[in-house]
């Protein structure tokens, strides 16, 4: 479903086009390695999930799509590959707080930046070491009034579907497989003829069902409308966005899955005095999903695994009445089943009930900003608190209608008869029940004092910041609490040489005692070569900068709570005759009070430039990260006879390195035509250096030295009979095999192919990701083309 056709209507009082030649002076003076995303590109990609639109948009950002039903098919972000053999996901920070990116619309966003090196990530605490997607929402501008309205309607056609066998060909090939296995054919010649002449989905004895044709539409729909209002004056500024998004699924039978979502955001800035201003940001999202008894994922699972002759959709009253005492008339709803499947997909989709999900999310930021330049030149401060609330409710109604499997047997006279066996009974609940519900709350407060001052050729700055967050969720036995204090100092001489150093004290209640805290640091420097006298007069070079950074960062992202504590539980009662017995206590897990933070040592070396009056720009970075102290279970250290209560330890180590690069060319032809061509590429390569693994196993079996996403399996030598003779081949211990089956290699030459012969046969994470984009604008009309590719997944 990758091809999408959209009709886009838009009207606005203020129109702004993105131009690739815009110079970001803040980026020019920065040491941090940051990729920036063009927000206009995201608006051009109509997708329910904003995360999906970021694929191919930035060097260093790897976007892996997830599968799921309507509203669930989002994406996971990775920054510069996989850093660990544990969790590798990057976090998303929206207006200073970690929040889901799919909760907002692209129309709400002012900027998206991908923070990639230690110098950029250290400011965001214990979760940020895997990378940060930094999102800032729009704010009003004094004297600039904007009203924008946009509406879209799109159709997403199915581009390709698998082709499955019909009942006749399925039965024919199944018989052939039986004969190959030395068994008798299952289907008689009469059965084969019956399938060849089948009347279709309701043929009682010989049904023939094309599930994709019967249950799927040829396209789904997408709809969207947004309204943006912003403006203000010197005293007050505002930005308001309201949006509706909706989509309908591919289901042809029964209730079509449907999603309706409303987003609203209001950002307000008020100047109270000459040095004090306040901000209030409020956002809300209400989402409603409705579908039948099966969501899209459940339906696809069924239609891709049911046999074409599994069962008839419906059984007529005439066929079943009187059998086994069954009473039926023309009003009866009776459905087919099989010995393998007691439920009937047609019945489930048409009459099986319904499911509804409700999401209500709210996000609030309240802040104060202090411009203290009047008192101390270059001094400013800010503080804000945040409160987010997420609630979820799922309700469902499940109906069961009678289903019957159909078998044939010979009666006492030797005649063939039909037997109906009830597999499901009639069950019609009167109202929906609550299937699940949850609540998640997030509280945080942030404070920062910053000082920037220039003294002739010298630019100096300092920044002290504190972040505190607390999270609580339904069903969680422990609230997560984390804090991060950072101090950064930077210095630049004559706009040519820049130095930066950052210290951070991180804290997390995932650990115990002194191990609750981790002390991180980063240093970096940059040389703006284009500002040197030997390049200053070269008109073709607008910017040429080299930069390097190194950092030592901590990570506590996916560490379980209470790993420091030994856990027990009440066990079974033991009987000691003649007494009545006694309760026992079982050891669940040994604690490790010395468990420490994971940490990474990161190096980045890069060069960036802009040339030819800023028409050509590009950046290349080499990165190397060594992640240590990765937490895991070191079962190789303990005898298996000891039980399954091994403590967690800091045992893992992963080396990750690679290159990311981007290049852009933007220009104009005449007064009305502008274009931009962009390319970004990310290459990553990692290997596991330490893990839970025995040292005395064969080298080909070791995961150490392999990528963290390595796939292990048996190595094929070809097919028996064609490439390899069965006679003399080592015994394969995992099932019967014959001519035509796959022959696997006996790598340890012990005369048997078993689990000890598994080796690396591929990897699941891409080595290289590529994005190519083309943007064309002519007299207010625009065309955006994006191509993406990945390599290395085998």
Question: Which role fits each region the language model picked out?
Answer:
Residues 89, 267-276, 282-286, 319-321, ...:
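Extracellular/periplasmic, surface-exposed regions of secreted and cell-surface proteins
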Residues 377, 763-793:
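Glycine-rich, aromatic-lined ligand/substrate-binding cores of catalytic
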Residues 123-125, 143-144, 157-160, 289-291, ...:
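Switch/connector loops and helix/strand junctions flanking conserved nucleotide-binding motifs
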Residues 1-265, 277-279, 337, 697:
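Short, small/polar-rich motifs associated with maturation and membrane association
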Residues 97-139, 160-165, 209-226, 245-281, ...:
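Outer-membrane beta-barrel proteins
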Residues 148-203, 666-764:
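Conserved small-residue
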Residues 92, 737, 747, 774-776:
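Short aromatic-centered micro-motifs
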Residues 347, 732-739, 790-794:
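Extracytoplasmic gating/loop element in the C-terminal half of outer-membrane beta-barrel translocons
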């Amino acid at each position: 479903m990758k091809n999408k056709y959209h009709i886009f209507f838009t009207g606005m009082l203020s129109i702004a086009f993105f131009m690739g030649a815009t110079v970001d002076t803040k980026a020019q003076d920065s040491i941090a390695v940051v990729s920036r995303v063009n927000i206009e590109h995201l608006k051009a990609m109509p997708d329910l999930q904003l995360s999906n639109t970021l694929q191919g948009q930035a060097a260093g950002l790897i976007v892996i799509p997830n599968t799921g039903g309507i509203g669930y098919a989002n994406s996971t972000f990775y920054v510069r590959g996989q850093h660990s053999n544990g969790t590798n996901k990057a976090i998303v920070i929206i207006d200073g707080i970690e929040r889901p990116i799919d909760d907002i619309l692209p129309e709400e966003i002012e900027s998206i930046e991908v923070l990639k090196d230690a110098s950029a990530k250290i400011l965001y605490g214990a979760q940020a070491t895997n990378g940060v997607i930094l999102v800032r929402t729009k704010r009003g501008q004094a004297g600039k009034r904007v009203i924008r309205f946009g509406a879209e309607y799109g159709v997403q056609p199915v581009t390709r579907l698998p082709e499955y066998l019909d009942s006749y060909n399925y039965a024919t090939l199944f018989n052939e497989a039986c004969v190959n296995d030395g068994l008798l054919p299952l289907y008689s010649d009469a059965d084969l003829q019956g399938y060849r002449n089948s009347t279709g989905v309701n043929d009682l004895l010989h049904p023939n069902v094309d599930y994709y044709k019967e249950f799927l539409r040829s396209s789904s729909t997408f709809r969207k409308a947004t309204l943006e209002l912003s403006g203000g004056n010197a005293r007050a500024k505002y930005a308001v966005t309201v949006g509706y998004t909706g989509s309908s699924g591919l289901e042809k039978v029964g209730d079509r899955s449907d999603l309706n979502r409303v987003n609203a955001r209001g950002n307000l800035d008020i100047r109270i005095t000459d040095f004090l201003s306040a901000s209030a940001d409020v956002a809300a999202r209400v989402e409603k999903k409705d579908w039948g008894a099966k969501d899209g994922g459940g339906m696809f699972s069924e239609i891709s695994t049911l046999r074409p002759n599994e069962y008839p959709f419906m059984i007529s009253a005439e066929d079943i009445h009187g059998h086994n005492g069954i009473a039926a008339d023309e009003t009866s709803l009776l459905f087919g089943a099989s010995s393998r499947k007691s439920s009937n997909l047609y019945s489930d989709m048409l009459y099986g009930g319904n499911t509804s999900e409700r999401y209500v999310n709210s996000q609030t930021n309240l802040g104060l900003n202090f411009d203290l330049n009047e008192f101390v030149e270059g001094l400013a401060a800010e503080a804000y608190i945040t409160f987010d609330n997420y609630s979820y409710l799922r309700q469902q109604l499940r109906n069961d209608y009678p289903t019957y499997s159909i078998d044939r047997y010979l009666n006492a006279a030797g005649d063939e008869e039909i037997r109906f066996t009830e597999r499901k009974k009639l069950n019609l609940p009167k109202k929906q029940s609550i299937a699940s519900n949850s609540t998640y709350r997030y509280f945080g407060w942030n404070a920062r004092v910053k000082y920037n001052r220039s003294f002739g050729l010298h630019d100096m700055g300092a920044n002290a910041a504190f972040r505190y967050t607390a999270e609580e969720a339904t069903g969680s036995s422990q609230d997560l609490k984390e804090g991060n204090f950072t101090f950064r100092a930077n210095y630049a001489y004559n706009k040519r040489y820049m130095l930066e150093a950052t210290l951070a004290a991180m804290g997390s209640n995932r650990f115990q005692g002194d191990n609750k805290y981790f002390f991180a640091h980063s240093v970096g420097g940059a040389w703006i070569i284009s500002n040197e006298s030997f390049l200053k007069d070269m008109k073709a070079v607008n910017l040429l900068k080299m930069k390097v950074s190194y950092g030592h960062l901590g990570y506590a992202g996916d560490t379980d709570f209470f790993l420091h504590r030994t856990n027990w539980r009440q066990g079974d009662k033991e009987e000691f005759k003649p007494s009545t017995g006694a309760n026992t206590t079982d050891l669940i897990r040994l604690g490790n009070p010395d468990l420490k933070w994971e940490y990474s040592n990161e190096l980045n070396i890069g060069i960036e430039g802009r040339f030819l009056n800023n028409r050509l720009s590009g950046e290349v970075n080499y990165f190397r990260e060594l992640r240590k102290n990765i937490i895991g279970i070191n079962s190789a250290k303990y005898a298996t006879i000891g039980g399954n209560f091994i403590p967690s330890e800091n045992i893992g180590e992963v080396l990750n390195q690679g290159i990311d690069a981007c290049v852009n060319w933007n220009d104009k032809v005449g007064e009305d035509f502008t274009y931009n061509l962009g390319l970004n590429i990310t290459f990553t390569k990692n290997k596991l250096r330490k893990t839970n693994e025995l040292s005395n196993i064969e080298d080909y079996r070791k995961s150490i030295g392999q990528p963290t996403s390595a796939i292990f399996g048996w190595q094929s030598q070809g097919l028996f009979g064609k490439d390899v003779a069965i006679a003399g081949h080592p015994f394969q211990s995992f099932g019967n095999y014959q001519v035509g089956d796959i022959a696997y290699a006996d790598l340890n030459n012990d005369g048997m192919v078993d689990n000890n012969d598994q080796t690396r046969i591929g990897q699941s994470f891409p080595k290289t990701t590529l994005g190519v984009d083309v943007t064309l604008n002519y007299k207010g009309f625009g065309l955006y083309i994006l191509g993406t590719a990945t390599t290395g997944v085998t």
